[in-house]
A protein has these predicted regions:
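NTP/phosphate- and nucleic-acid-binding module
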Residues: 1, 5-122
C-alpha cells in the first residue's frame, strides 16, 4: 500500500509506501523545519538596515519596512525626538550584539555606546 505525502511548504508530492511513512515523515519534518528557519533568518536579515546619521535614519524610516540599527547616546530627549519626527521607537538593545556601527548618536551626534534596534509599531 502507498500514500501520497503533499508538502505544504514546497508543494511537492511524493508517493511513499506505508512501511516507510514514519521514517520519511521524520525526514520531511526536519527538512521543513530547517528550511522555514533559514527562510525566517534571511527575511529578518533583509529587513534590518543600519543608519549612521539622522538623515539616513529618517529616509530608512520612511521607505523601508523592518528595523533600523543605529547608535544612541542614551539621552531620553533624543529618543523622544526620533519618536516625534518619525514615529519610530526603540525596540531593543541586545546584550550580545553591541558592535559599534558608529561612534556617535544617530540623532544628536554626541558620543554613543549603545546599539539600538528601532522600529515602527503596526
Amino acid at each position: 500500500q502507498m500514500c501520497i505525502r503533499d508538502s505544504r511548504d514546497t508543494r511537492e508530492k511524493i508517493v511513499v509506501s506505508l512501511d516507510e511513512v514514519n521514517e520519511k515523515l521524520a525526514e520531511v519534518l526536519e527538512t521543513m523545519q530547517n528550511d522555514m528557519l533559514e527562510k525566517a533568518k534571511a527575511f529578518l536579515a533583509s529587513h534590518i538596515n543600519d543608519a549612521h546619521d539622522y538623515n539616513e535614519f529618517k529616509a530608512i524610516a520612511e521607505t523601508k519596512p523592518g528595523f533600523i540599527r543605529a547608535m544612541w547616546c542614551g539621552d531620553e530627549a533624543c529618543e523622544n525626538k526620533i519618536k516625534e519626527d518619525t514615529t519610530v521607537t526603540s525596540r531593543c538593545m541586545p546584550f550580545g550584539d553591541q558592535e559599534q556601527i558608529s561612534d556617535v548618536c544617530v540623532c544628536c551626534g554626541k558620543p554613543a555606546h549603545k546599539l539600538v534596534y528601532w522600529g515602527k509599531a503596526y
